[in-house]
Regions:
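Conserved beta-strand positions in the central sheet of alpha/beta enzyme cores
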Residues: 80, 106-107, 134-136, 201, ...
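Active-site acidic/histidine proton-transfer and metal-coordination neighborhood
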Residues: 104-105, 112-232
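Bacterial N-terminal signal peptides
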Residues: 10-22
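Histidine-acidic metal/acid-base catalytic patches
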Residues: 31-49, 65-66, 155-163, 183, ...
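N-terminal secretory signal peptides that target proteins for export/translocation
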Residues: 1-6
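N-terminal pre-domain/capping segments
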Residues: 26, 31-133, 152-156, 227-229, ...
C-alpha cells in the first residue's frame, strides 16, 4: 500500500471515529436535554422539596449547616423541616443556615396542639426570622399511649405497635363527632398561626386521620366554620397500609382531593411497606401520570425516609424521579430502569 493510500485510510478512520464520538455525545446531550427541558415543570428540580433529612433518617446526623450545604449541593431550592423535641434549641440555626444558602423554608412538620407552649414558641421563632413555612399537621399525639422503651424496638415490634395505634385511632369516636373534633383542633391551630402569616395543611400519616375521605371531611367542616385556606399534603408513602389502599382507585380519589392538595411527597410504592426508590415500585408511575395529566400545580417532595446517608438517599430519589419524568413525557426514552425493579408477591409492576 502506498504512502498516499495509508494517509487516506488514516483520514477515513479518524473521520469515522469523530462521527462515533460526536454521535455518542449527541445522544448524551439529547438525553440531558430531555431531562431538563421540563425546567419549570411539575417534576423539575427547582420545584422539589427535600423532606425528612434530619436524624434519625440521616445516618450521618448532620447539623443545620452541614444539612443545608448538602441540600444546596444537590440543587434543592425548597426544604421541609422535621423537628424533634430536642431540636428546639437549633431552630434558629436551621433557619439562619437556610437563609445563608438561599433555600426556602417551605414547610414545618407540626405535631403540637394549639395549647402546647412549644407551639407558640415555634411561631415566635418564625416571626423573629420573618419566615412563613406552612405547618404540616397530622394526628394529635395527645392521649396516645406511646411507650418509650429503654432499648430499641425490633422492626416487628414497631410494626405491631403501629398497627395497634392505628386500630385504636379508628375507634376513638363516631365519624361525625370525630370530624368535628379534628376540625375544631385544626381551627385552633389556624387561629394561633394566622397572626404570624402562617398557613396550615393536613398531613396524611397513619390511622383515621391519614385517610383521604376523612381529611376531605375535615376540610369541608372547616369551610363551614369560615376557614377556607387549609390544604392537604399527600404522601405516597402513606397511600396504603393494612387499613386502606389509595392505589386501587387513585384516579377517582385524586379528582376529589386535587382542589385541596398543596404538596405531593413522592416515593416508590410497595405493597409490603418496604421503602424503595421512585421507579422501583408498582404504582408511582400511574399515580404521577394521573397527577400530571390533571393539570395540578404544586410542590413535589422527595423523602429521605429510607435511611442511611441522606445525601445518597436524595441523590437516588432524584435519579428515580428524573427517569419517571422522562418516561411520562416520552415512553421508552428513559432507557433502562436506574434501579432493580421490585415486584410484589403477585409479580405486579405497572411499567
Amino acid at each position: 500500500m502506498t504512502s498516499l493510500n495509508y494517509k487516506r485510510l488514516a483520514a477515513f478512520l479518524m473521520a469515522f471515529l469523530v462521527l462515533i464520538v460526536d454521535g455518542t455525545r449527541f445522544r448524551a446531550e439529547a438525553a440531558s436535554r430531555t431531562r431538563s427541558e421540563s425546567a419549570g415543570g411539575l417534576w423539575a428540580h427547582n420545584n422539589l422539596v427535600a423532606w425528612m433529612v434530619t436524624p434519625p433518617w440521616d445516618a450521618k446526623a448532620r447539623g443545620p449547616e452541614e444539612r443545608v450545604q448538602m441540600l444546596e449541593k444537590l440543587g434543592f431550592k425548597n426544604y421541609a423541616f422535621m423537628p424533634h423535641d430536642k431540636d428546639i434549641l437549633t431552630y434558629d440555626a436551621e433557619i439562619e443556615a437556610l437563609r445563608r444558602h438561599g433555600i426556602n423554608l417551605l414547610a414545618w412538620r407540626f405535631y403540637l396542639d394549639a395549647d402546647d407552649p412549644v407551639a407558640k414558641a415555634t411561631l415566635e421563632t418564625f416571626k423573629r426570622h420573618n419566615v412563613h413555612p406552612r405547618l404540616w399537621v397530622s394526628q394529635s399525639l395527645k392521649g396516645m399511649n406511646l411507650p418509650r422503651p429503654h432499648g430499641k424496638m425490633s422492626a416487628e415490634e414497631q410494626h405491631q405497635l403501629l398497627m395497634q395505634l392505628r386500630r385504636e385511632d379508628l375507634t376513638k369516636a363516631p365519624q361525625e363527632l370525630r370530624v368535628k373534633q379534628e376540625a375544631d383542633r385544626i381551627n385552633s391551630l389556624v387561629k394561633l398561626a394566622a397572626p404570624y402569616g402562617i398557613k396550615v395543611a393536613l398531613y396524611n400519616h397513619n390511622g383515621w386521620f391519614g385517610m383521604m375521605d376523612n381529611q376531605v371531611a375535615i376540610v369541608e367542616r372547616l369551610k363551614q366554620l369560615g376557614v377556607t385556606d387549609v390544604g392537604i399534603v399527600y404522601n405516597f408513602s402513606h397511600a396504603r397500609d393494612e387499613l386502606h389502599d389509595d392505589t386501587l382507585n387513585f384516579p377517582e380519589l385524586w379528582k376529589t382531593i386535587k382542589p385541596y392538595v398543596v404538596t405531593v411527597n413522592i416515593t416508590g410504592m410497595q405493597t409490603d411497606g418496604d421503602l424503595v426508590y421512585p421507579s422501583q415500585g408498582d404504582s408511582e408511575f400511574d399515580m404521577m401520570r394521573t397527577i400530571e395529566r390533571s393539570g395540578w400545580r404544586g410542590h413535589v417532595g422527595l423523602i429521605a425516609e429510607k435511611g442511611g446517608d441522606a445525601e445518597m438517599t436524595l441523590r437516588n430519589y432524584l435519579v428515580g424521579l428524573d427517569w419517571l419524568a422522562v418516561e411520562l413525557k416520552h415512553p421508552g426514552a428513559g432507557g433502562p430502569h436506574p434501579f432493580p425493579v421490585v415486584r410484589d408477591a403477585s409479580g405486579r409492576h405497572n411499567y
